Structure formats: structure tokens, C-alpha cells
């Protein structure tokens, strides 16, 4: 048997997202996202602002598009999914099963992502009467949606709306009320181009806006109207119709937004504003990449995002059914998104194209600020536009985000932080938002509070005052000779009138009955009633209590000499001792029993761990109380026990009981406990750490979970129908308990040395937590220096400015402004604007970088400490040089030195591919790998894509040449070369030190 693959972390990029009321709650909206083959339902909590995953389902295919729709009169939205399966699938979310249910599945074409097979585009009539699924080329199918007699969704056979020689760019449903459903398509007819051998027809090709109408009476789709467009468009936005708006579409074209509609409506055309002081070429068009519509009973507006990330608010002014004006206003700047979703709860969810996906709270709608609003009525000459100044977030507040590694360029696995467990170092992102992320296996922990204590505590518990309370009332902290009681409120404060005995250590405490508290200490048991009356049970002289366990109705203690004493709460809320006691053959090390099952009076079993490396199951049933039932031998002495009932995935009821055993050798042993006979079976073992394992019961998502403390803290919990045993990315903890308050509804209180910590676990189900370090350009490759464990990263961006290039470009623009001034007044104004332009340095990680001409490159070599993210040294290459490979080389002529070789291309153009050669930069690592120094630059006749250390020399792929270089004082010295055909050498690696593997690329393929 061989391991094929194991997915440690699923796809993090989101290619499409829709929102709606999928759970049937009209006051709540969810977001449905497609992550490659995975369909997820996300809930954005309006109280906490956190994103949680309600449901996750693998479709085992590529999801091409998503759509949400609702039948008239319904309160629940459906999800239409188009994938590479050649089928249209309609899903409904089941709140009872917590999963998606397939309502319909219709096959319409071949499998695969083909240009002529529908699935790339989905559109629906706003009234939910018809659905259109379209291909990139030629084919479109329309399905009629209806209800049967039982009010179930039905779908008709597909109606064809094909058009030969047409390429589709966007499709949207038009809001026409209850008239025949109409769809708008952005198309190009290439028939003339296809039959023109000269290529002249391509230069005069026109894009058309085509309206397709579904005649419900004739059951037929017709092309109702087609209109050629002046500018090339890429996106259609549907405008609310009927009583909500004027209907029609907004066509997002190059540099313009154009409103169009059928009938007598004239076009309303508004330029897309540009950034002031932008370094981009003014001739470069601006395009809208995504949009979102928000509609209420009294108003509607659109948020559109440009390819630079700037978000604009667009509104329409109408006179009756005719739109007279379009207004556009700068809203905020966000990372470029694949989809925007505006929720009723006031959130904006952005599925970012690159980097983390973000959730924003819409604080303002931008109506009452000083930002200028531009109108289609403002007269402008052709080609002129409006200008605005970018700024920080003003209308949006970031409240949460979902980590995304997209795109991950390369990675390295190693324990560079000396943590006894390897980390994954991933180079991610693009441009100025690029990052180096350190991934560690473990749940991310949020510290809510950390307080120092007067000594080193031994244990901690939380208790409620009443069984119906939502939050805990006290934190009980035990020391070796005292007990500290803290009250939980807006702040955590010490109290002295709680009824707990503070002059002795506490062995255990809990809420017993409905409103009483119980404290077990070495000399006895203290029963604290709600009316402050206290009953005490004293331990026999010279036989103090060693161990204890309890639930809401039962208490079991172990006295010195391995004697077990059992107590149970009677109907009068009195704690009664059982008449008999049980002496065991070995010292009691730990004990546990489960919570009282629902509908029963007591837990049936007591589990006891003994010093003879056994665990005993003892009955607590009234017929054979304290009678031994079964025994299990252990590989080491037990440190702690925890009996927990877990839910069955099929029925959702608590039906399986497990005994978790923490051993002193650092292992966790889990066995199934038979609820009838008490037998143990199905043993499973997991190594957790070097310290003895202590187990505690906590609540995660209102369900019992197991918290284990060893040299590292672990959490064993149920999430979305699966059990997860995951370490915490946090320092070692010694004792823990569940914690709940108004400020932290579900957390954990723990002790570590002399501190009390309140922790929250927010990102459940995530295998890795991330530490992010920012980079300047898109990272390409990395190498690790073995001695210092430092990392050398090369970063390269195409069509980007270097720092010198930016300063030169600003100076050119400033001089142009001054030269354009005609009189003294204009010259003074131009001088002021030029000064502002020269000092304009926006944060590119927020606003993105300006785009230079094709063939311009910006590159840098960075020496970074991976543990802290500190940049020790950075070298920026000249403009036009693109770094593509990096390697550490030890030349045999320089035995005691390690060199960094960086291979580059000079003024490389991608289409068509051409360059002015390449070069190799040589750097010397100094100060034990803490610095590097530039030595020399070696020009090459072709681009350099691969460098490798080979037998004390540098083996370099120079275009289609394989060259061997030795170290020289002024440049590298070429020793020999070999031509490898008409190919480019991309990767050099070694197999068994002597066998050389060369990976090369043809123009249209690859070969090894």
C-alpha cells in the first residue's frame, strides 16, 4: 500500500461567492463560497463580527460559477451550481442535517471546462422564474423554474438560445417584473473575422449588448434586441426594476459606466474616475472587475471595484421609468476581489483575488462626507475624466478575515525556529501585498487576558451560581496552601464571601444540584447552599482526601490507603454518603465519571486509574454500587482520566461513551466504554508531548471537548461531523477549565507558571495558524543558509517601478505640470501641485503599486530571519532586471566562503518573448550568514532561469546553454558549456549526487 496524497489544508482561494437566506431565517443572511471543488456556507455573526463555517462540502469537481435565487413567495434561497461535470445542480441547505441537499441535477453537456460547454456563466430572472446557463462560446440554455402541487421546486427541459460564432463576456438577468423573463448578454460576433484571411475585420470588430427573451406562453427563447457598443465592455450589472427601480443594465466598459435599457431610454454615460497623482500611464484604460448591488424598500445603490482596488458607490437618478443621471463617488480602497457581497446585517464580504478574504462592517454609506461626487451631467470632452484622492478606510471597518495562501509561489519545510516540530515557510501573494507566511500545525489562540498571581497555582476551575445561568460566576484558583476565589464580571476581582474555604488547597469544585456549590479539600467536603448555609463532611483523622471527581449529582473521593467513598445528592438536595466503601489494591492516581445523562439520575460508571498501571471500571448503579466491572492494563502509569459522551453523526444523539486516559509517558489513550457492561474496547493511542498528560472538560461550540495539557496543549473536539485532535500554537499550560462571560461567551481559563490566562479559540477546523511577514515584490524563490538558518528570498515584479523609477516618474510628471502653466497664477498653482506630487508616497500594501510599461521589471534580494521576520539586508536590482533563480554555492577555490548567486533576465518581454540577455549576481555571505555583500555581476547572452551548486562550481542554465562557472575576481569564469537544443533550461536538480536532472521548457510544452 502506498500513500497517494494527503490534503493537509484545503484550497483557500475563493473563485466565486453569493449571498442569501439559505437557512430560511429572513433576518439572517449567509455567504456561499466556492473554493475550487469545495462548497462552503459561511455565517457572519452580527454580534461578534466573526466568520464561521456552517457547512463544508467537497463536490469532487471544479465549481465554475454559483448563483442564488428565490421562488416568488418563498423565504429561502436556493443555490445553483455549474461545474466541470456538464450538469446544472440546484442545492438547498438543510438546517436539520447541517448539509446541502440536492434538489435537482440536470445533464446538459460533456464534462470538463470547455469553451463551448455551458457552465461559465449563470444568470437568473430576479423573480426566480427562469435560469440561464451559458458557455464562453456559442451555447446558452434556459431552464424554467416552477413549483409542483406540493410546493417543491421543479425545473423544465432546457431551451436553446445558441448563437454560432459568438463569444460571451457577461450575462445578467433583467428585472422586468412579471413580464417575460429577459436576459442581457455581452457578446462579440467573430464570424467575419473567422473568414477574413487578411485580419482587417478584427480591427473593426464590435461588441454587442444582446437581450434574450423567454416567451413563457410559447416556451421559446428569442433574441429580442441587439445594440453595438462604442467601448469594449467586460461586466454587466442588473438594475432593480418594477416598483424598486427603472430596470435595465449598467455596462462596465473601458473608462466608462453606461446605463442602457430597452425602449425610449437614452444611454447615460459616466466616466470612471482616476486617481490623482497616479504614476500609471494616462492612456491605460480603467476597468471594473466586480460589483455588488444593495437594495432596500426605499433605495438601492451599487458598489463597483476597479482593477486598482478602488471601490466606488454608484447611484441612478430617475424621472419615472427613465434614468436621467448617474452619479459615482469614491468609497474606499480594498484588495482586488473576485466577488463582493453586501449583507442585510451591514457587512461587506470580499472574496479577494489574492491574499486574505475580508469581512468589513459598513459604518457609513458615504452620503455625508466631503468626498466629491461626480455626475454624468458634468460636461467633459471625449477622453477626459474625473480625479480623486485615495485615503484610508473611512466608510468600512475591517472586523474579520479568512486566511488565504493564494497564490503560493513556493515553500520550504524545516524547523528553522528550533521548536522541535517543522514549520512550513510559504511565499505567497503578488506585488506589494506579497508575504512570507510561517505555518505551524496548531489552532490559533487569542489571548483575552493575562494576570499574574501571587504564587504558582496548582489548579483552576470555573463555577456557575445556578444551572440556568449562561455565564460563569467564579474562577477558583488553588495553590499549595490556599484557595483564591475570583468573581467574573466586567473585571475579574477577588471575593472573600463566596463560602469557599480559602486557607487550604482545593482538590475539586463544581456546581452541584441546581444552585449549590461543592468544594473538596484534603480535610473534607464543603457543601455551600444558595442561601449561604454550609454543610461539611470531615475526612477520617490522618487519612486525608487524595483524589476526587464529581458531577451535578454525584461525588467520589479517594482517601489515603486507596479507599473509595461515594456520595450522591438526594431529593432534598442533601449530600448522602453511600453506606459501603471500596478499598483498592493500589494507590489511586486519578478518577473520573461522566456528566449525568439526560433523563437519568446518575452516571453509571466510575473510572479509577491506579499506580499498578491499570484503570478500573466500577459500577455506581444502586443494585451493585462500587462493584468492579472491568479492568484495562496500561503501558504507563495514568496521570488523568476523562469520561465523555460523544454524539453519533447519524442520529445527533449522545450514544457513544469514550474513556480518555492521559499517561505519564506523554501519551493519550482513548477507549470505547460499553454503556451496558462497562467493558473497554477499540484502544487508540496518540503521543502528545514529553510531560504527563492532564485532561480537562471544556465546551467548544456548546459541545463537550477534551483539553489536554502536556509539553504542549491539545484540543480534541467535534467540528462539522469530524473529530479533530489539534495542538494549540501557544505556550505550555498546566491546568485549564471552560470559561464563559459576557465579554467572552466561549473561552478557556488556564494557568501557566504564575499567570492566569483567559483564552479564546476562534478559527476551529483550521490545521495551521499563520505568522505573516510582508514583502515588497512578488516572491519567486528562496534558499536557506544552513549555518544561520536565515533565508534568502528573491522578489520580482513585471511592469513595476523600482524606487528610483518612481522618483524619476514623479519628477517627470511634476515638470510636465510646470511646463503646461501659461501665466504666473497657473505657474504658482502648478508649483504647488508639483511639490505635492514629488512628496506623494502612498502605502502600496494598501493602495497597490503603479503599473509601468511592459518589459520593465523591479527586483530585490532579501536576507530575512524566518523566526522573527526581520530583514537583515536587502539589495535592489536596477530597473529592467528580473531575478528568477537563487542558489547557495561553495566554490572549491573559495573553501571558507558561501556565495549567493542570483540569475536574472534583462528587459524581458513576455509577448512576444524576447530580451536583451541575462546576468548572474554574486553576493558573499558574511558575519555567519547575517549579512551579504555584492561582489560582481556576470553578463550572459540569454536569460538565466536555473543555478545549482555542482562539485565546487556553479552549474547555470543560460537560455538553452548549460554552463559551468568558477569564481573570478571581477566576474564568474565560464569553464565549459553544452547546448541543449532549442529549449530553455528552467530547473536543475540532482538525484543521488551524480545523476543530473535537467527540466526544460519548449515553447508549447515541456520535457525532462
Summary of predicted features, one role per range:
Residues 1-1008:
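Large eukaryotic, non-enzymatic subunits of multiprotein complexes that serve as scaffolds/tethers
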Amino acid at each position: 500500500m502506498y500513500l497517494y496524497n494527503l490534503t493537509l489544508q484545503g484550497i483557500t482561494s475563493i473563485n466565486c461567492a453569493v449571498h442569501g437566506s439559505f437557512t430560511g431565517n429572513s433576518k439572517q443572511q449567509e455567504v456561499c463560497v466556492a473554493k475550487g471543488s469545495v462548497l462552503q456556507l459561511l455565517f457572519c455573526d452580527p454580534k461578534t463580527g466573526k466568520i464561521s463555517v456552517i457547512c463544508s462540502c467537497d463536490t469532487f469537481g471544479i465549481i465554475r460559477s454559483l448563483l442564488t435565487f428565490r421562488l416568488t413567495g418563498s423565504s429561502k434561497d436556493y443555490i445553483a451550481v455549474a461545474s466541470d461535470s456538464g450538469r446544472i445542480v440546484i442545492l438547498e441547505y438543510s438546517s436539520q442535517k447541517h448539509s446541502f441537499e440536492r434538489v435537482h441535477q440536470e445533464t446538459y453537456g460533456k464534462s470538463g471546462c470547455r469553451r463551448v460547454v455551458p457552465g461559465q456563466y449563470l444568470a437568473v430572472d430576479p423573480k426566480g422564474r427562469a435560469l440561464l446557463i451559458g458557455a464562453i462560446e456559442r451555447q446558452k440554455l434556459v431552464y424554467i423554474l416552477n413549483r409542483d402541487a406540493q410546493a417543491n421546486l421543479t425545473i423544465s427541459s432546457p431551451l436553446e438560445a445558441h448563437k454560432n460564432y459568438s463569444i460571451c463576456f457577461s450575462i445578467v438577468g433583467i428585472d422586468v417584473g412579471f413580464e417575460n423573463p429577459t436576459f442581457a448578454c455581452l457578446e462579440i460576433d467573430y464570424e467575419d473575422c473567422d473568414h477574413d484571411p487578411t485580419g482587417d475585420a478584427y480591427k473593426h470588430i464590435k461588441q454587442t449588448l444582446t437581450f434574450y427573451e423567454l416567451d413563457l406562453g410559447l416556451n421559446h427563447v428569442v433574441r429580442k434586441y441587439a445594440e453595438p457598443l462604442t467601448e469594449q465592455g467586460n461586466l454587466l450589472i442588473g438594475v432593480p426594476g418594477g416598483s424598486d427601480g427603472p430596470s435595465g443594465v449598467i455596462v462596465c466598459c473601458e473608462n466608462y459606466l453606461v446605463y442602457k435599457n430597452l425602449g425610449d431610454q437614452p444611454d447615460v454615460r459616466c466616466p470612471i474616475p482616476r486617481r490623482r497623482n497616479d504614476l500609471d500611464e494616462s492612456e491605460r484604460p480603467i476597468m471594473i472587475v466586480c460589483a455588488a448591488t444593495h437594495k432596500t424598500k426605499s433605495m438601492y445603490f451599487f458598489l463597483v471595484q476597479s482593477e486598482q482596488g478602488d471601490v466606488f458607490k454608484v447611484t441612478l437618478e430617475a424621472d419615472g421609468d427613465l434614468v436621467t443621471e448617474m452619479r459615482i463617488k469614491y468609497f474606499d480602497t480594498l484588495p482586488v476581489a473576485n466577488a463582493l457581497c453586501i449583507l442585510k446585517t451591514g457587512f461587506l464580504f470580499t472574496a479577494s483575488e489574492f491574499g486574505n478574504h475580508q469581512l468589513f462592517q459598513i459604518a457609513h454609506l458615504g452620503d455625508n462626507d466631503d468626498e466629491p461626487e461626480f455626475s454624468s451631467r458634468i460636461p467633459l470632452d471625449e477622453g477626459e475624466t474625473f480625479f480623486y484622492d485615495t485615503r484610508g478606510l473611512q466608510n468600512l471597518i475591517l472586523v474579520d478575515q479568512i486566511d488565504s495562501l493564494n497564490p503560493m509561489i513556493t515553500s520550504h519545510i524545516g524547523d528553522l525556529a528550533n521548536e522541535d516540530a517543522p514549520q512550513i515557510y510559504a511565499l505567497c501573494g503578488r506585488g506589494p501585498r506579497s508575504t512570507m507566511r510561517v505555518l505551524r500545525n496548531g489552532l490559533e489562540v487569542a489571548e483575552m487576558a493575562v494576570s499574574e498571581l501571587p504564587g504558582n497555582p496548582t489548579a483552576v476551575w470555573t463555577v456557575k451560581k445556578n444551572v440556568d445561568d449562561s455565564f460563569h460566576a467564579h474562577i477558583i484558583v488553588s495553590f499549595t496552601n490556599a484557595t483564591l476565589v475570583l468573581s467574573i464580571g466586567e473585571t475579574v476581582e477577588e471575593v472573600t464571601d463566596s463560602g469557599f474555604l480559602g486557607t487550604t488547597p482545593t482538590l475539586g469544585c463544581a456546581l452541584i444540584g441546581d444552585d449549590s456549590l461543592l468544594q473538596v479539600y484534603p480535610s473534607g467536603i464543603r457543601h455551600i447552599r444558595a442561601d449561604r448555609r454550609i454543610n461539611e463532611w470531615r475526612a477520617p483523622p490522618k487519612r486525608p482526601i487524595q483524589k476526587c471527581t464529581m458531577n451535578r449529582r454525584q461525588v467520589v473521593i479517594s482517601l489515603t490507603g486507596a479507599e473509595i467513598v461515594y456520595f450522591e445528592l438526594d431529593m432534598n438536595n442533601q449530600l448522602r454518603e453511600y453506606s459501603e466503601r471500596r478499598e483498592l489494591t493500589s494507590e489511586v492516581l486519578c478518577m473520573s465519571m461522566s456528566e449525568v445523562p439526560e433523563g437519568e439520575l446518575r452516571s453509571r460508571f466510575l473510572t479509577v486509574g491506579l499506580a499498578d498501571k491499570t484503570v478500573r471500571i466500577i459500577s455506581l448503579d444502586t443494585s451493585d454500587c462500587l462493584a468492579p466491572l472491568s479492568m484495562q492494563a496500561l503501558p504507563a502509569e495514568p496521570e488523568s482520566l476523562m469520561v465523555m459522551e460523544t454524539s453519533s453523526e447519524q442520529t445527533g444523539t449522545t450514544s457513544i461513551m469514550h474513556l480518555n486516559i492521559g499517561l505519564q509517558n506523554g501519551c493519550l489513550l482513548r477507549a470505547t466504554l460499553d454503556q451496558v457492561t462497562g467493558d473497554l474496547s477499540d484502544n487508540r493511542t496518540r503521543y502528545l508531548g514529553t510531560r504527563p498528560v492532564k485532561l480537562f472538560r471544556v465546551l467548544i461550540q456548546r459541545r463537550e471537548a477534551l483539553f489536554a495539557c502536556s509539553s504542549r496543549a491539545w484540543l480534541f473536539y467535534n467540528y462539522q461531523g469530524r473529530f479533530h485532535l489539534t495542538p494549540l500554537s501557544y505556550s505550555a499550560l498546566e491546568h485549564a477549565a471552560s470559561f464563559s462571560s459576557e465579554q467572552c461567551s466561549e473561552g478557556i481559563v488556564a494557568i501557566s507558571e504564575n499567570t492566569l490566562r483567559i483564552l479564546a479559540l476562534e478559527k476551529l477546523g483550521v490545521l495551521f495558524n499563520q505568522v505573516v511577514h510582508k514583502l515588497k515584490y512578488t516572491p519567486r524563490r528562496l534558499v536557506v543558509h544552513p549555518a544561520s538558518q536565515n533565508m534568502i528570498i528573491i522578489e520580482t515584479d513585471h511592469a513595476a517601478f523600482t524606487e528610483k523609477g518612481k522618483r524619476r516618474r514623479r519628477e517627470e510628471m511634476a515638470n510636465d505640470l510646470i511646463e503646461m502653466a501659461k501665466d504666473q497664477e497657473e505657474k504658482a498653482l502648478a508649483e504647488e501641485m508639483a511639490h505635492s506630487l514629488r512628496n506623494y508616497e502612498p502605502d502600496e500594501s494598501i493602495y497597490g503599486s503603479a503599473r509601468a510599461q511592459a518589459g520593465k521589471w523591479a527586483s530585490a534580494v532579501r536576507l530575512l530571519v524566518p523566526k522573527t521576520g526581520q530583514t537583515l539586508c536587502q539589495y535592489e536590482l536596477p530597473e529592467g532586471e528580473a531575478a528568477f533563480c537563487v542558489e547557495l554555492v561553495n566554490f572549491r577555490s573559495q573553501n571558507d566562503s558561501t556565495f549567493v548567486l542570483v540569475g536574472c533576465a534583462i528587459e524581458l518581454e513576455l509577448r512576444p518573448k524576447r530580451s536583451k540577455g541575462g546576468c548572474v549576481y554574486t553576493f558573499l555571505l558574511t558575519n555567519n550568514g547575517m549579512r551579504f555583500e555584492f561582489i560582481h555581476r556576470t553578463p550572459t547572452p540569454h536569460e538565466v532561469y536555473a543555478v545549482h551548486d555542482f562539485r565546487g562550481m556553479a552549474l547555470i542554465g543560460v537560455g538553452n546553454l548549460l554552463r559551468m562557472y568558477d569564481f573570478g575576481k571581477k566576474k564568474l569564469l565560464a569553464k565549459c558549456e553544452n547546448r541543449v537544443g532549442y529549449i530553455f533550461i528552467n530547473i536543475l536538480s540532482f538525484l543521488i549526487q551524480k545523476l543530473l536532472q535537467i527540466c526544460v521548457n519548449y515553447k508549447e510544452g515541456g520535457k525532462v
